A protein has these predicted regions:
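Catalytic strand-loop segment that frames the active site of acyl-thioester-processing enzymes
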Residues: 23-40, 134-147, 269-289
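Short, conserved loop-to-beta-strand elements that form functional interface hotspots
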Residues: 69-116, 192-237
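Surface-exposed beta-loop interaction hotspot
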Residues: 116-121, 127-131, 233-274
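Cyclic-dinucleotide signaling modules
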Residues: 131-136, 156
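Short glycine-rich or small-residue beta-strand-to-loop segments that form or flank ligand, phosphate
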Residues: 69-75, 179-186
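Phosphate/pyrophosphate-binding loops at sites that engage ATP/ADP/AMP, CoA/4′-phosphopantetheine
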Residues: 57-66, 166-176
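Extended repeat-based interaction scaffolds and adjacent low-complexity, acidic/S/T/P-biased segments
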Residues: 13-26
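Conserved small/polar residues in nucleotide/adenosyl-binding loops
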Residues: 290-297
Length: 297
């Protein structure tokens, strides 16, 4: 049975890529990416085209699905985020992530949405977005930030706050968090602070080289407020058994990340009764064990 489907939908001003996983009678998953195809249009025109396309798809190809995570990629967050938020406030009943990462096609906005069918959702009082299905509770967080003095302090506060959010739901960072995304302003300057804070917080949460880490992205990305040096998206699951979670190791080709001073897994997969979800870290892969066969390579 081929339960995976991919299709592209072209409209006058947008191109949508749709990836669907159909599990029969269980929850179906969608990843969609909506691109503007008119780089010459104003930001407002591109934004409206993307939003109109999304609204249309909800009545057609995505009928019955609910948004779990939306991530908007902007070319100039400082001048664009307020307009986006003003237009999407009523429809923001999911984890919302907004980051300045200009689309490579020269447009001003792109939208990635993760959707599910046959789930119950709610926004928790602590800001996490809860998704219930079967025996599992999934917690998504988008664009968490603060304005502490530097990237180290901001990251430490983000992670400590997240630990408390999880504790309120009977969860632990080490046992339940599956994936994090860190978007770092001027990453070449500020990433060292992120690494230091993450390493130090992880030790307090039993996340060490002897146990395991969390698959993650650490990449350049800006918030609309220049004082925000780090913003964080998160995903955790309650109800998993330890044997359902596995980590990607390839010792003949990739050394452990702690050997070069950072604390993340290169990949994680989670087994459910009807599917396997795979989370690959979105970061540079460094291998200290590589030996070039030729000085020219």
């Amino acid at each position: 049975m081929n339960n995976k489907k991919q299709q592209n939908i072209q409209s006058e001003k947008t191109l949508t890529e749709i990836f669907k996983y159909n599990a029969g009678g269980e929850a179906s998953e969608y990843h969609i990416i909506i691109h503007s195809t008119k780089p010459e249009d104003t930001y407002e025109e591109q934004l409206n085209a993307v939003l109109n396309t999304y609204d249309y798809l909800l009545t057609q190809e995505l009928k019955g699905a609910v948004a779990i995570l939306k991530r908007y990629f902007l070319s100039d967050a400082a001048n664009q985020a307020d307009t986006l938020l003003a237009l999407t406030t009523e429809g923001s009943d999911c984890a919302l992530s907004i980051v300045e990462q200009p689309p490579l096609d020269g447009t001003k906005i792109a939208l990635w949405v993760y959707l599910l069918t046959d789930v119950q959702t709610q926004v928790l009082h602590n800001g996490l977005f809860e998704v219930k299905h079967s025996a599992y509770r999934h917690f998504w967080g988008g664009s968490a930030f603060n304005r502490a003095a530097n990237s180290e302090y901001q990251t430490r506060l983000l992670l400590n706050d997240y630990v408390m959010q999880l504790m309120e739901q009977g969860c632990k960072l080490a046992d339940n968090c599956i994936r994090t995304w860190f978007f770092v302003q001027n990453v070449d300057v500020n990433y060292a602070g992120v690494v230091k804070a993450r390493n130090e917080v992880f030790v307090t949460q039993n996340l060490t080289e002897k146990t395991h880490y969390i698959s993650s992205t650490g990449i350049d990305g800006r918030h609309a407020d220049p004082k925000v040096l780090v913003q964080m998206d998160t995903y955790a699951v309650a109800g998993l058994q330890p044997e359902q979670i596995h980590f990607l190791y390839a010792p003949t080709h990739l050394n452990p990340t702690y050997e070069y001073g950072v604390s993340f897994e290169r990949g994680t997969y989670v087994d459910y009764g009807d599917r396997r979800q795979v989370f690959i870290s979105g970061t540079a892969s460094i291998c200290l064990l590589y030996t070039s066969p030729s000085p020219r390579d």
